[in-house]
A protein has these predicted regions:
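Primarily NTPase-proximal linker/entry elements flanking Walker-type ATP/GTP-binding cores
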Residues: 1-145
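Conserved catalytic-core segment of NTP-binding enzymes
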Residues: 121-135, 148-190
Length: 190
């Protein structure tokens, strides 16, 4: 991705007319490549034919998964759905508490049977959260998973185990724009 942009930018800047805006040329090249990489069409979240729709959030620590979980749940609630948040990030200190605060602020219930801070089994929490959602007739389940400061074998295995256990209808990869060039490598790893 980056090397492709670099080649195009060098070629465009070589052919640049006097007085043209170099920054604008580079911006247009990056924009074109991002649209090609990510797709030009907006796509709605894939909803399950039979409720609940299960959405798993994945990504590195600090990327905004927990915040997105709350915003996504609020979006669905505003549409008339009955979302629930599932606290499967049991590694990061106070991650469960953070999701509970986000849920409370958004008016969304949170399934959090474990205190987190390294205690509990995230796969079992995800599985139990879906069972709870079915029993309480929630039609959208958003599973907030753990991140790490970087991609590692433990993180990838945990994400895979949760995915295999809950068979989500959607897996949303959350990345912070500040991740920069590493975002592509991280997305490929996930």
């Amino acid at each position: 991705f980056v090397s492709k942009i670099e080649v195009q930018a060098k070629a465009a800047l070589t052919d640049l007319q006097a007085g043209a805006n170099q920054a604008q040329v580079i911006f247009e090249i990056v924009n074109k490549e991002l649209v090609e990489l990510l797709g030009s069409q907006a796509r709605r979240v894939r909803l399950a034919k039979v409720a609940p729709t299960v959405i798993m959030l994945a990504g590195l620590q600090g990327a905004g998964k927990t915040t997105l979980a709350g915003k996504l749940a609020k979006y669905f609630a505003d549409l008339g759905d009955t979302p629930i948040l599932v606290a499967s990030d049991l590694q990061r200190p106070n991650a469960v508490t953070q999701l509970q605060v986000v849920g409370q602020n958004a008016g969304i219930p949170v399934f959090a049977p474990e205190p987190g801070n390294g205690v509990g089994n995230p796969v079992e929490v995800a599985r139990a959260g879906i069972a709870f959602a079915k029993a309480k007739l929630h039609n959208i389940v958003i599973v907030d998973t753990a991140g790490r400061l970087g991609v590692d074998a433990e993180l990838m295995q945990e994400a895979k185990n949760i995915r295999d256990a809950i068979s989500p209808d959607e897996i949303l990869f959350v990345v912070d724009a500040m991740t920069g060039q590493d975002a592509v490598r991280t997305a490929q790893a996930f």
